[in-house]
Amino acid sequence: MLLIPAIDLKDGQCVRLKQGDMDQATIFSEEPAAMARHWVDRGARRLHLVDLNGAFAGKPKNEDAIRAIIEEVGGEIPVQLGGGIRDLNTIERYLDDGLSYVIIGTAAVKNPGFLQDACTAFGGHIIVGLDAKDGKVATDGWSKLTGHEVADLARKFEDYGCESIIYTDIGRDGMLQGINIEATVRLARAVKIPVIASGGLSNLTDIESLCEVEDEGIEGVICGRAIYSGDLDFAAAQTLADRLRESDDA
């Protein structure tokens, strides 16, 4: 089980939001690259970046901070990024800068042809971010609920050739209420590509619960507010996940 620290970028700073509300941002660091180094030193094997301004603006907005993070740790571990990615040129530029994966969310739902083109042009580097509430997909920085069922879109995007799916329960994100295990497993069973859980991770019990269903196709989990607030010790959580994996393999 891959535990992936999230670095959410707003105005060049590392922040956390509550349920995607830009007005409810807590600043955790004014040096995102230093924060990236911190998580790598704590044992992170991948980083998850979100350009929050970009997600709302529909185009990249925190490129300096993103490049600084890639320069700091991109040679050591994979770095993935979502937010404001709406065209192939942006994807190409980010991959050339050293990103390992780009995450397409709203644009995949609104313009499936773009996702299909991205998967064709940059195979192995495209992750789809599906954000949902009560099984319905949300777009535009979570501000709009669609009528699309998560599993239906996931199967469609799998056919396009995306690498994996990040599934975020937006009713829980930033609320420390626990991962929606049931919904995540349901999605993982609907597709053959890996699913990464997101939204609500709060403690070691969540890690244990996820590890129990890892073989359903759940590759990892995004770690957000809990590792910043101190509710979850990241290094201890990754160690626990590794130990549980080893005991399962034994």
From Swiss-Prot:
<keyword id="KW-0368">Histidine biosynthesis</keyword>
<dbReference type="GO" id="GO:0000162">
    <property type="term" value="P:L-tryptophan biosynthetic process"/>
</dbReference>
<dbReference type="InterPro" id="IPR013785">
    <property type="entry name" value="Aldolase_TIM"/>
</dbReference>
<keyword id="KW-0413">Isomerase</keyword>
<keyword id="KW-0963">Cytoplasm</keyword>
<dbReference type="InterPro" id="IPR011060">
    <property type="entry name" value="RibuloseP-bd_barrel"/>
</dbReference>
<dbReference type="InterPro" id="IPR044524">
    <property type="entry name" value="Isoase_HisA-like"/>
</dbReference>
<comment type="pathway">
    <text>Amino-acid biosynthesis; L-histidine biosynthesis; L-histidine from 5-phospho-alpha-D-ribose 1-diphosphate: step 4/9.</text>
</comment>
<protein>
    <recommendedName>
        <fullName>1-(5-phosphoribosyl)-5-[(5-phosphoribosylamino)methylideneamino] imidazole-4-carboxamide isomerase</fullName>
        <ecNumber>5.3.1.16</ecNumber>
    </recommendedName>
</protein>
<feature type="active site" description="Proton donor">
    <location>
        <position position="131"/>
    </location>
</feature>
<dbReference type="InterPro" id="IPR023016">
    <property type="entry name" value="Isoase_HisA-like_bact"/>
</dbReference>
<feature type="active site" description="Proton acceptor">
    <location>
        <position position="8"/>
    </location>
</feature>
<dbReference type="GO" id="GO:0003949">
    <property type="term" value="F:1-(5-phosphoribosyl)-5-[(5-phosphoribosylamino)methylideneamino]imidazole-4-carboxamide isomerase activity"/>
</dbReference>
<dbReference type="InterPro" id="IPR006062">
    <property type="entry name" value="His_biosynth"/>
</dbReference>
<dbReference type="Pfam" id="PF00977">
    <property type="entry name" value="His_biosynth"/>
</dbReference>
<dbReference type="GO" id="GO:0005737">
    <property type="term" value="C:cytoplasm"/>
</dbReference>
<keyword id="KW-0028">Amino-acid biosynthesis</keyword>
<dbReference type="InterPro" id="IPR006063">
    <property type="entry name" value="HisA_bact_arch"/>
</dbReference>
<comment type="similarity">
    <text>Belongs to the HisA/HisF family.</text>
</comment>
<dbReference type="GO" id="GO:0000105">
    <property type="term" value="P:L-histidine biosynthetic process"/>
</dbReference>
